[in-house]
């Protein structure tokens, strides 16, 4: 028992000296002398313990109740973190806490010797000095953008390339090499903008945009290269196709990409396909079809069923490639001369009723609604419903519609009949009043 007590006193002395040295060190760094009295109190407590002796229970209680104890000049919390004296912020490291305290005190010790810039953080001064030296160590992997700060690079990736930070493991070096090879293959294909490749598996697969079906008959190679797989497009055959590793850019950027690629195609490829020529063997169009609204389809089918007389030579065929019509157009000639109604939409494809097989040359075409009539009388009646200045304004009641679908639904709802009955009733009342 007599040998253990001096060892305990030596340990307490060393601990008190360590606390004193750390306190003076912190005071020299922060420039504050407010904790001198606390250090003297700790030293006085140490001398008293040397003179009067120190029993073990007092030391154990002071270490257990260390929530309010000053260590290194700062107050510690119950979990051992250093607590800020101005707010509830706590940190494990002293340097991080000192930087935080400078927010309250307004101290900015890190100053630029070339301009009046000053900051409380050393890393901010390092980033500022790069503006004087012109150094830009952070480079974007998708383009030639370079910057001097990491936060600017993250903002550039989110704003320019629509890349969101994904939680998970970082891609390995092999994935980075594979990504670089894919980017070279894509750039060799002549894209104006590079396709984004997500090295970590995304949460969902991006579906093919619907409006790209307008270019299905003109650029079949782009469809297979951009949407089936980039590895299949590259003739090396080194990379395997994995649909989860490909992330298509947003629709607007992809549309501009296809438009630029279309402008760079040869003249013979840009010409629209004639109805006599069949589809290319490599063409794999992803046209999504949907039946028209029930009311509109019934009205149009009735008009076509009632028409039996041949069309006059005034009918002019227009071989446009829009697939957003409630009635089928000559775009379906490439598949067996059988016209089917098709609407490019994001809904899954469903079978649609087929119209009687008839030569599109004999059909009358409404360019506003993209509808075809086999009878000249029905065509004339339909064209009389369009306004002169605004084709989507009803010529009967004057109702202005947004597009051809709203225009067709306007007649399907019978709004014109109700308006005509009201007008006739008003004219009758006026006649009776007179």
Swiss-Prot record:
Disulfide bridge map: none
Biased composition (Polar residues): 260-274, 337-349
Cross-referenced SMART domains: ZnF_C2H2
An annotated Gene Ontology molecular function: zinc ion binding
Zinc finger (C2H2-type): 82-104, 110-132, 138-161, 364-386, 392-419
Start and end residues of each stretch annotated as Disordered: 33-57, 260-357
InterPro entries assigned to the protein according to its UniProt record, in alphabetical order: Ikaros_C2H2-ZF (IPR050589), Znf_C2H2_sf (IPR036236), Znf_C2H2_type (IPR013087)
Composition-biased stretches (Low complexity): 296-313
A GO CC term assigned to this protein in UniProt: nucleus
Localization in the cell: Nucleus
UniProt keyword terms in alphabetical order: DNA-binding, Metal-binding, Nucleus, Repeat, Repressor, Transcription, Transcription regulation, Zinc, Zinc-finger
Recorded superkingdom: Eukaryota
Note, other: 'Pegasus' was the winged horse in Greek mythology.
Protein family (similarity comment): Belongs to the Ikaros C2H2-type zinc-finger protein family.
Description of how the protein assembles with itself and partners: Probably self-associates.
Function: Transcriptional repressor that binds the core 5'GNNTGTNG-3' DNA consensus sequence.
Protein name: Zinc finger protein Pegasus
Organism expressing this protein natively: Xenopus tropicalis
Phylogenetic classification of the source organism: Eukaryota, Metazoa, Chordata, Craniata, Vertebrata
